[in-house]
Amino acid sequence: MTELVQQLLVDDADEELGWQERALCAQTDPESFFPEKGGSTREAKKVCLACEVRSECLEYALANDERFGIWGGLSERERRRLKKAAV
């Protein structure tokens, strides 16, 4: 019984994060999604605009309080503003 419960938990976790396998950023240079301070985010955001899992990515970043990088097409500052506007 315990093995079954553990497998169900693993399956649920895999399903929740399955969108990451379909993310376009997984096929590109991760450095562009985590630019140095003052660096350009243009290329990363361009990739996000064409990505089919953009909304799942943004939801994940907001739910997990991701503080670095471009997630769902938004920078950390843009995500912070979005959270404030939602409250």
Swiss-Prot record:
<keyword id="KW-0411">Iron-sulfur</keyword>
<feature type="domain" description="4Fe-4S Wbl-type">
    <location>
        <begin position="24"/>
        <end position="81"/>
    </location>
</feature>
<keyword id="KW-0963">Cytoplasm</keyword>
<dbReference type="GO" id="GO:0051539">
    <property type="term" value="F:4 iron, 4 sulfur cluster binding"/>
</dbReference>
<dbReference type="GO" id="GO:0045892">
    <property type="term" value="P:negative regulation of DNA-templated transcription"/>
</dbReference>
<dbReference type="InterPro" id="IPR034768">
    <property type="entry name" value="4FE4S_WBL"/>
</dbReference>
<dbReference type="GO" id="GO:0003677">
    <property type="term" value="F:DNA binding"/>
</dbReference>
<keyword id="KW-1015">Disulfide bond</keyword>
<comment type="function">
    <text>Acts as a transcriptional regulator. Probably redox-responsive. The apo- but not holo-form probably binds DNA. Complements a whiB2 disruption mutant in M.smegmatis (AC Q9S426).</text>
</comment>
<comment type="similarity">
    <text>Belongs to the WhiB family.</text>
</comment>
<keyword id="KW-0408">Iron</keyword>
<keyword id="KW-0238">DNA-binding</keyword>
<dbReference type="GO" id="GO:0005737">
    <property type="term" value="C:cytoplasm"/>
</dbReference>
<feature type="binding site">
    <location>
        <position position="51"/>
    </location>
    <ligand>
        <name>[4Fe-4S] cluster</name>
    </ligand>
</feature>
<keyword id="KW-0805">Transcription regulation</keyword>
<dbReference type="InterPro" id="IPR003482">
    <property type="entry name" value="Whib"/>
</dbReference>
<keyword id="KW-0749">Sporulation</keyword>
<dbReference type="Pfam" id="PF02467">
    <property type="entry name" value="Whib"/>
</dbReference>
<keyword id="KW-0804">Transcription</keyword>
<feature type="binding site">
    <location>
        <position position="57"/>
    </location>
    <ligand>
        <name>[4Fe-4S] cluster</name>
    </ligand>
</feature>
<dbReference type="GO" id="GO:0047134">
    <property type="term" value="F:protein-disulfide reductase [NAD(P)H] activity"/>
</dbReference>
<feature type="binding site">
    <location>
        <position position="25"/>
    </location>
    <ligand>
        <name>[4Fe-4S] cluster</name>
    </ligand>
</feature>
<feature type="binding site">
    <location>
        <position position="48"/>
    </location>
    <ligand>
        <name>[4Fe-4S] cluster</name>
    </ligand>
</feature>
<protein>
    <recommendedName>
        <fullName>Transcriptional regulator WhiB</fullName>
    </recommendedName>
</protein>
<dbReference type="GO" id="GO:0045454">
    <property type="term" value="P:cell redox homeostasis"/>
</dbReference>
<keyword id="KW-0479">Metal-binding</keyword>
<dbReference type="GO" id="GO:0030435">
    <property type="term" value="P:sporulation resulting in formation of a cellular spore"/>
</dbReference>
<dbReference type="GO" id="GO:0046872">
    <property type="term" value="F:metal ion binding"/>
</dbReference>
<dbReference type="GO" id="GO:0035731">
    <property type="term" value="F:dinitrosyl-iron complex binding"/>
</dbReference>
<keyword id="KW-0004">4Fe-4S</keyword>
